[in-house]
């Protein structure tokens, strides 16, 4: 026993004096292809909003999430009659009749109303968490059909930046996606190492209950979720997301009906703001003010090189 205690103490002392080993390389996940399924996309977030880019070459889908994006509404779910079965449930358990106790609990320990809707909670007052939407970027390589070389998709665990890079033809393309805690928005930084080689359009969508409009350099998606009570009219949570494109080195921006196109650029920064009326009744003003405050800063602040 004394020998074991001595060895244990010796190992502690040696461990305390071992120098820290630094590899000089950041911790990261990396892949040589875009994400084929949602689970393979890189998760990014600042605690309130989240982005998940899949790193697609021709079409890139970035899933958008916001923490308060819930359908449903207030409801009285208290069931004061449930306790009447508690004694019987306990008795059955003490007698080893677990299956009977479980069945009785399932039948009596339930809330009033429709509950979770048996997996259909989105359309009953119970509600469910909802996807805010998808930001879809369609890249135009100006007719280039050259193969892709050197594709690398990486999530840096030290700085929480997701990157994708590859070479097509004579041009190298780089993308960075991250979320800003200080400015409470998502950032997408796109570059090409040749003049006028960055061409793309972006749009937004979600499965239901949304409208998208373009306004200059901005794209706005907004809508309202079901409250689970009125099935004919949406009276639940309202939401909005606004995306603004900035071209630090020039280029052309053309708004369409529900998309925004960028042509002849070599660098673009997209700022993504999101809000619901759970916290902010003026959610349209909220998403606009987040972008306005961010634009006051040097655009270089929204790149990992700054």
What are these regions (language model features)?
Residues 20-304:
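Aromatic-residue-lined binding/catalytic grooves and analogous aromatic/hydrophobic interfacial grooves
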Residues 4-13:
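Sec-dependent N-terminal signal peptides
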């Amino acid at each position: 026993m004394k020998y074991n205690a001595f060895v244990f103490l010796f190992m502690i002392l040696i461990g305390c004096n071992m120098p820290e080993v630094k590899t000089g390389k950041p911790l990261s996940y990396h892949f040589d292809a875009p994400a084929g399924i949602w689970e393979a996309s890189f998760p990014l977030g600042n605690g309130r909003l989240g982005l998940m880019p899949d790193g697609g070459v021709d079409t890139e889908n970035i899933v958008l999430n916001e923490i308060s994006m819930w359908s449903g509404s207030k409801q009285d779910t208290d069931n004061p009659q449930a306790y009447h079965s508690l004694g019987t449930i306990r008795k059955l358990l003490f007698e080893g009749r677990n299956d009977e106790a479980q069945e009785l609990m399932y039948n009596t320990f339930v809330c009033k109303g429709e509950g979770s809707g048996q997996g259909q909670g989105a359309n009953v007052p119970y509600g469910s968490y909802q996807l805010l939407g998808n930001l879809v970027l369609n890249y135009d390589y100006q007719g280039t059909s050259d193969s892709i070389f050197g594709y690398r998709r990486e999530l840096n665990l030290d700085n929480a930046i997701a990157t994708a890079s590859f070479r097509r033809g004579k041009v190298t393309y780089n993308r960075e996606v991250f979320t800003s805690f200080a400015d409470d928005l998502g950032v997408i930084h796109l570059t090409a190492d040749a003049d006028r080689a960055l061409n793309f359009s972006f749009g937004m969508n979600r499965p239901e209950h949304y409208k998208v409009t373009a306004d200059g350099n901005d794209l706005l998606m907004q809508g309202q979720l079901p409250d689970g009570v009125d099935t004919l009219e949406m009276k639940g949570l309202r939401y909005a997301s606004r995306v603004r494109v900035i071209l630090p080195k020039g280029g052309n921006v053309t708004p369409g009906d529900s998309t925004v196109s960028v042509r002849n650029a070599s660098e673009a920064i997209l700022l993504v703001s999101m809000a619901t009326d759970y916290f902010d009744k003026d959610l349209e003003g909220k998403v606009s003010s987040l972008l306005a405050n961010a634009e006051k800063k040097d655009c270089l602040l929204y790149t990992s090189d700054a």
